[in-house]
C-alpha cells in the first residue's frame, strides 16, 4: 500500500486502506482472523476498524469482534504499530429504538 496519510499535528501515519473487522469471530474464527490480519499488515496496512456492536447480533457474542482483535494485538505484541478506529453510540440490539448518544454511552463504547 502506498500513499500513506499523515495526520497533521500528530505522529500518526495511516495506510490509505483500512481493514474492517465486522467478520472477526463470526465468519472467521480466531485462527483465520489472525492470518487475515497478518496478511493485511504484511501488505502495508495499519488501520484496523472495529466497533463494540460488531457481532452483537449473534448471542452470546457481545463484543466478539473487539475481543478477537484484542487477542490478535496481544499475540503480536506490537500495539503501537497500528491505528485502531472504532465507533460508538449504536443502539443495543434489543432496544434499537433507544438512543445511546450520552457521554456515558460514548465512554462505555
Identify what each model region corresponds to.
Residues 1-83:
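N-terminal binding-site loop/beta-alpha segment at the start of enzyme catalytic domains
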Residues 80-92:
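A short, structured active-site edge motif that brings together acidic residues
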Residues 54-58, 91-97:
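A short acidic, helix-capping loop that chelates divalent metal ions and anchors anionic groups
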Residues 95-109:
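Glycine/proline-rich, positively charged
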Residues 68-72, 87, 105-109:
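Generic beta-strand or strand-like secondary-structure segments
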Amino acid at each position: 500500500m502506498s500513499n500513506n496519510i499523515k495526520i497533521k499535528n500528530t505522529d500518526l501515519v495511516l495506510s490509505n486502506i483500512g481493514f474492517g473487522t465486522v467478520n472477526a469471530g463470526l465468519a472467521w474464527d480466531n485462527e483465520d482472523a489472525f492470518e487475515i490480519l497478518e496478511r493485511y499488515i504484511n501488505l502495508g496496512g495499519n488501520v484496523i476498524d472495529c466497533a463494540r456492536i460488531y457481532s452483537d447480533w449473534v448471542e452470546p457474542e457481545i463484543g466478539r469482534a473487539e475481543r478477537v482483535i484484542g487477542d490478535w494485538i496481544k499475540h503480536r505484541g506490537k500495539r503501537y504499530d497500528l491505528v485502531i478506529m472504532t465507533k460508538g453510540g449504536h443502539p443495543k440490539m434489543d432496544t434499537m429504538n433507544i438512543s445511546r448518544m450520552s457521554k456515558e454511552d460514548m465512554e462505555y463504547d
